[in-house]
């Protein structure tokens, strides 16, 4: 679907947040989230609805020491004809390939980006020097950590949301090994293209002010499938009703974008949210004619964003009720 058509559908879907109705309760939102999650998104449900964090302020803290390698290392894998996993056990990094180069989505931590991304690409027979663009979903250390490495060593262009470029530049303690230089500031609906690979940016502020989600196409034995990639999920922003309004609006916006693009594959930058690690392992058992483990269907993709939105609405309502 053309960019203009997708944006038109998205705009119509998010023209305004709901007002509280007499029947609205915290429990009604939690039940709706649990129903939508089913057995597909239990990790997301547990993180957002069962024990969401209560954040009072965003702190510019220095990164902690690197954890033991066995807590994060995992071998890279070819997942689709043109998409490769070069992430860790907990955090994802994806390489979308084309005849003219690679688009890398997210870059893990500083401490593991060398081994998982650079080393992983080489293990898969891919050349890190062919990474033309690095798209950062949001400027937290578990996703932006390897951006400077890719920029400095391979000349990759770094794409990030404007507010997250701003926070990166203002950070005093968050980048002891250096920051990526401000490069491409992403716009809503922008396409990042290398050869026959293209990623459409959907700005989804909430998790951070500059969070980016994405729509792109992968191929499964030559069959094209559309991916909806969620760029930020957890409630690690200050717990205020206006902040949850922003988050909820973005979840609805991304749900509309995914539906407009007929996305049947869901991916996230945290493996707990899309079950990437077990799904990759299950590919070894896939028989001819069986659906791809990531190809969950359009309805399931939509249900993911129902989970995130309903959990957020429950938290928002708790805040409003606590003030009454």
Descriptions of predicted regions:
Residues 1-6:
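Bacterial N-terminal signal peptides that target proteins for export
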Residues 7-16:
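Bacterial N-terminal signal peptides
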Residues 20-66, 221, 233-324:
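Accessory terminal helices/loops
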Residues 23, 28-32, 111-115, 119-191, ...:
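Active-site HxH/HxHxD metal-binding segment of metal-dependent hydrolases
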Residues 69-124, 128, 213-235:
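Conserved beta-strand hairpin/beta-sheet module of binuclear metal-dependent hydrolase folds
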Residues 82, 96, 106, 138, ...:
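Divalent metal-coordination and catalytic microenvironments
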Residues 112, 139-145, 165-168, 209-212, ...:
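Active-site environment of divalent metal-dependent phosphoester hydrolases
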